[in-house]
Amino acid sequence: LCFNYFKDRLARFYGTVVQYCYDNFDVNKDGKVSKIEASAVAKIDLARQEIKTLTGIGYFSNLEILNCKECHELTTVDLSNNLKVRIGDEMFYTCSKLSKIVLPNNILEIGESAFYGCSSLKNIDIPDKVTEIGYSAFYGCSSLKNIDIPDKVTEIGDSAFRRCSSLMSINIPKEVTEIGRQAFGSCVSLTSINIPKRVTRLEDLFSNCSSLRSVTFEKGSQLKYMVEGVFCDCEALTSIEIPASVEMIDMYYCINLANIYCYPSIPPILNDFRCKNFVLYVPSQSLEAYKNSSWSEYYSSIKTIQ
């Protein structure tokens, strides 16, 4: 979909959805679309249309809802001038050839499954005002290599970046308080991550991140729960430091995890722990407490932090 306005203030449409435009936006049925008619459009539904580019639609000045679900030939989108549009649920669902998109600067959230299965998308600039990234927002964006999450984001939904198999690095801003289940699951190229201090729960977060070597926590971490196999099958992870605030731990199938530095003075409750051949380092004043706690099965592996 692409069009231009000429001096007569009429829209000229091009591409494979010309008839759709005239059928839906030409209110007076004169075979033309005026700027007034275009400004009255709040929703455009192009689901499953065979379009390749979506540019020049800034003239729909009051456009709020755009649906491009399953537009499998779509490659390029420019929404920079559509200041009222929302990046809604499933907006570009399985647009597998989408490789370039420009988003409007004033959006506040990325909807659920908005870019699900956009496997050709290599990069995306998320506007600074965004505060929430929804469930499965970028699930299966297998060409996405790096992404900067804006500083105002506070919530990253379940499976938000799951199966982003080329993702090597990601910046999680300090304001984030919640990271959903499997948010980074099966990100097999991800090598390092830093968890902001306001996050209190990590649940099944990094399963199958086979290249993850470094996990760090911001100073003053308020993390309480590391559960549901948070690092399941993280084969490259050999060492980890557990913040002093942690109260409960589930960890399994970290087959190469050799050193665990556990800083809580009160031993965290151990629900499920299927790791072998590791050394657990704990505060010296808490050595006996750990050996007589739910960690007692690993009595001989517990040593003091030097």
Question: Predicted segment positions?
Answer:
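Extracellular/surface-exposed low-complexity segments
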Residues: 2-7, 21, 279-306
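Aromatic (phenylalanine/tyrosine) cluster motif
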Residues: 3-6, 13-14, 116, 135, ...
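Intrinsic-disorder-associated, low-complexity terminal segments enriched in Asp/Asn/His/Tyr and depleted
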Residues: 4-8, 106, 158
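Disulfide-bonded cysteine-rich modules in secreted/extracellular proteins
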Residues: 10-21
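Structural signature of tandem-repeat unit edges
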Residues: 45-86, 96-109, 119-132, 142-155, ...
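Consensus positions within tandem repeat domains that build extended binding/scaffold surfaces
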Residues: 89-93, 111-116, 134-139, 157-162, ...
